Amino acid sequence: MTYLLALDQGTSSSRSIVFDTQGRIVASAQLELPQIYPRPGWVEHDPREIWRTQLATAREALAKAGLAAADIRALGITNQRETTVVWNRATGQPIHHAIVWQDRRAEPLCAQLREAGHADTIQRKTGLLIDAYFSGTKLRWILDNVNGARAAAERGELAFGTVDSWLIWQLTGGRRHVTDVSNASRTMLFNVHTNQWDDDLLALLEIPRALMPEVLPSAADFGRTAAEVLGGEIAIGGVAGDQQSALFGQACFSAGMAKNTYGTGCFMLMHTGGVFQTSANGLLTTAAAQPTAAPAYALEGSVFVGGAVVQWLRDGLRAIEHSGQVQQLAESVPDSGGVMMVPAFTGLGAPYWKPDARGTITGLTRGTTIAHIARAALESIAFQSAALLLAMSRDAVASGGAPVSELRVDGGACVNNLLMQFQADLLGIPVVRPACVETTALGAAYLAGLSSGVYQSTEELSALWKAERRFVPTLDKHRADELMARWEHAVAQTALAA
């Protein structure tokens, strides 16, 4: 038998999954990753803990599967994107905690860049908006604030990487300093047209080029693990940022195919093929996972509060004792009773980009119960995701394509049947849940399998993808449009609440 190992390094945990060549899970392991909050708005991880937990889960998954390194054809890596690590090349030790994608400390620098008129250039070259979310300004902060960092960087003594680069450095014993195009495209330093680090952007942010890793396609030779790491050498054959990896694991390989990941937030990506498409509707353009040197792009939108609204029902309102109870509570009423909730706890993301918005609950009457509020909270996840998909479809049609005809779903909240049915009703298209919902890790395994010859083509991978359940719309379009209009009215009211 042939097996593939996927390392899935996320924001809250490190996981490793062994897959067979049919994409079935053989064994898995997971460890929580400690979060560090030095100041309000700052979020850090200890890079040594990232490595320790990831290595431990890889070893545990292999042990659970009863496999040795020699049984693994190749290893794939998927990771939290944008999180920034800088380490000493000689010692392999980080010079500062990793600055996590959620961290906002670089916002003053971003404001300066916007005020200086650099937004159009950065979007044209990178597909991104100027935001502290991305790696470039985090890296600049480290160079400016860690004693001796800039001088050491200019001497070529330091290495920068997103989490994938850090893991590969550790896995290979410091022999490879590399990343893939999908991770590079989230730095605000990478030109997605040339697939190169952009000298002008590096100069703008005062970042020495010597810091930067080599950029490879997402299915490539990223090196081999040092024998002592996993008990033998394993080829590292696939790397992709978590959302691009999920798009790949969902077998969304051609223009117009889309997936939505329902986690703490929601992340929706629509493949645009080889076309770099700038959104007119508040979306980002990003590099999709690229198994070859051929360019591939996607439109991306992020919802800040998805499943987190269920955590709020549990911890804030104490309406439920555990998250699994929300569907039963919401189903105890036929609808939300006119209640509309906009969970703008941390502002609103795409396609609205209203950082100052605050959450609202409207439509309350004397007859409103906690069940109506729970249902409105669940429905808010679907409303926000529908706004993203409608924006994507407008962009697709404007560029001569067709609107999205099916949405593939994954992430923890996709197991909620009420939510998935309401999502299909709002969108007027089928919502499809796959047999394997671990699509992020599966995407990394598929990329590793392509580079190592386990799979010959993406067509072969498409044939492996299987649906577990298909949610078909049951609401007429007129009613769905009415509901979306009510949602947009509620969103407009969040500006008044700010």
Curated annotation (Swiss-Prot):
Any one Gene Ontology BP term: glycerol catabolic process
Enzyme class (EC, first level): transferase
Classification via CDD domains: FGGY_EcGK_like (cd07786)
EC numbers for this chain: 2.7.1.30
GO molecular function: ATP binding; glycerol kinase activity
Xref: PROSITE patterns: FGGY_KINASES_1, FGGY_KINASES_2
Assigned keywords, A-Z: ATP-binding, Glycerol metabolism, Kinase, Nucleotide-binding, Transferase
Binding site for ADP: 11, 15, 264, 307, 412, 416
Protein name: Glycerol kinase
Organism: Delftia acidovorans (strain DSM 14801 / SPH-1)
